[in-house]
Curated annotation (Swiss-Prot):
Keywords from the named record: ATP-binding, Chaperone, Chloroplast, Nucleotide-binding, Plastid, Repeat
Repeat 1: annotated span: 5-70
Protein name as catalogued: ATP-dependent Clp protease ATP-binding subunit ClpA homolog
Annotated segments matching region Repeat 2: 80-144
Amino acid sequence: MFERFTEKAIKVIMLAQEEARRLGHNFVGTEQILLGLIGEGTGIAAKVLKSMGVNLKDARVEVEKIIGRGSGFVAVEIPFTPRAKRVLELSLEEARQLGHNYIGTEHLLLGLIREGEGVAARVLENLALDLTKVRTQVIRLLGDTAEVSATNGQTKGKTPTLEEFGSNLTQKAAEGKLDPVIGRQKEIERVIQILGRRTKNNPILIGEPGVGKTAIAEGLAQRINNRDVPDILEDKRVVTLDIGLLVAGTKYRGEFEERLKKIIDEIRVANNVILVIDEVHTLIGAGAAEGAIDAANILKPALARGEMQCIGATTLEEYRKHIEKDSALERRFQPVMVGEPSVEETIEILYGLRDRYEKHHKLVISDEALSAAAKFADQYIADRFLPDKAIDLIDEAGSRVRLMNSQLPPAARELDKELREILKQKDEAVRSQDFETAGQLRDREMEIKAQIAAIAHSKKGDEENTKEVSVVTEEDIAQIVAAWTGIPVNKMTRSESEKLLQMEETLHGRIIGQDEAVVAVSKAIRRARVGLKNPNRPIASFIFSGPTGVGKTELTKALASYFFGSEEAMVRLDMSEYMERHTVSKLIGSPPGYVGYNEGGQLTESVRRRPYTVVLFDEIEKGHPDVFNLLLQILEDGRLTDSKGRTVDFKNTLLILTSNVGSKVIEKGGGGLGFDLSEDQTESQYGRIKALVNEELKQYFRPEFLNRLDEIIVFRQLTKDEVGEIAEIMLKEVFTRISEKGIQLEVTARFKTHLINEGYNPIYGARPLRRAVMRLLEDTLSEEFLAEKIKEGDTAVVDVDDDGKVKVLLGEKLELVAN
């Protein structure tokens, strides 16, 4: 019998057992069932009793008057009294007479009244209730609910189970609760055609997440409500089924199947329901315990025979993973592909939705903001789909503008802070019974509240006088895109414009020489930030080639630090780690079946997380040649597909490849035959070296790879003067480190000249200088530290004697070059 009970009826029985325990009785009688009915609170029985003035407290008093309290010993299993069992049987009979195939709280109450001789009936009589009137009221309420469901659903038959686990979209459309559906005429027409079939009349909407599959079902409901459909669909109602709610609370075996069968039977009898199941793949496996059958198999016969019309919606991936595997289920559904709308169609959709969002956020959304949302979403948000991502931009921009404009003025915020402090002090004064202080604080509290109210009122008055309405502009959309992706789309401030114009100067503070490289990188960044770059290619792609130790990797670090915030704000791939052929998979992720398949690739995952960044392929020639094949798509189209089939967008990255190809040529000096008659010998030598390096690159890299690069930049060898400037930078770094230990360090001009002579090597660049600083300065100082010759607070001067030996002098002031 209990399998027919509704969840509310089961709750009543459980509450009845609790009442028995509370009173110390080891049985459940009619009086406990009555207390359970009142205590349940939400069922028809509880509503009827409440409307007639019965409450739980009074009922408990009456029950205790009649039967008193028990011994206190209560068994775990509490049996029903014969009279209570009789009530349950009568409630089943009442349900049958009313044509219901379930037992609810209303049937239990009718059973109690019909039994008429138990303690429950006496309690109701003692509470001045007429049992006949209670019965009439229950039946009337049952009739009303049936009528309400009939009128709301335009139904011929009653569908209580479907209404419990579903949501009527046609009714929502009539109440204006659905967003308007713009476009999608072809898809809706195709859905209507499939619904008009005699058998297998079940369309399934397949498309990427966020393209508007559910919106098509809502569009159909709106059309039915507007009578803009063929006559075969005119009286239909569209009901969306909640699979989660259907499964929830099914504690016992067969309960889920029974619910689903009831829904199928109700739809078959009503014959005017179009069932919508969003995320239709959840049917497969839903409710399937060990040995039980799942929802999909229960629905199959009804779907094939045309007894029920069902619209499913799922993504391409889930369709392939779940439904295509079950060919018997697949043939019952007719696929309708829902593609991503174009930018123009998205703008139309946004125009249609504008009123709803303006009403919600209480502001105005400009036409430029709508166009910008569609264009920016398409260009900068790669891993989601239109129109969903564009709608999200509008929604969040509206929220941002509203919150910014609804904030209190600074004066009111200060007062609010003071008010909180006064309230805290007042509470403490009351607790310590210092009522005089509490009274003074209360007066101050009233003053501050009045001041805050006056400021808020004047702000509101100013807004009303100026008739200013908050407006969402293109700039607001750009701010949201920047917050989501890190790509600066918003208009440049004057300070940022100046920063970009002075970029070469700033980079030269760290990179000595190498004008060509610094200028090329700066131009690329400016082009991208102003928005003049090709939107389908990366910001720029360079090969930095040339001798070792001249600043190729350092320039990339300086760029990341200056423009992207920190040296770490770049994706750095040391190609020496990709020397074997199979390590290429580390870039885009392991193929299926291999270890690490679910982890994604180092390159693709980094760029997906941070789409606006510098990507550095360091020492490119050390990697396996197959790595270069991967780079072809990135360099040309700014895209790469990872091992899971996801397209990663490289259109907002700056690609830099460093290489030492040609360093042997540079080592030889690039000298030509005959006399050098040019005025500038250095320039002609650089020209020859550049030509030779380009030839070497052509021999090493494929032409289709080199042809895709924006520029091949050959770095110059460092002159002695440039090494002197680099020495200044390195010495400053040492001074900073040693000043943290409380020591002031100075070097003489003689030491500096000696350092440059020791560290200058045109073939190896600045690295010998770094070694010279370490050997001559850092090693000497560390020995002095350990010998405790230098202590905190000292001023140390580093010099060299005539033999070239480094000396550390304390407190002596010599001719200083660097501080």
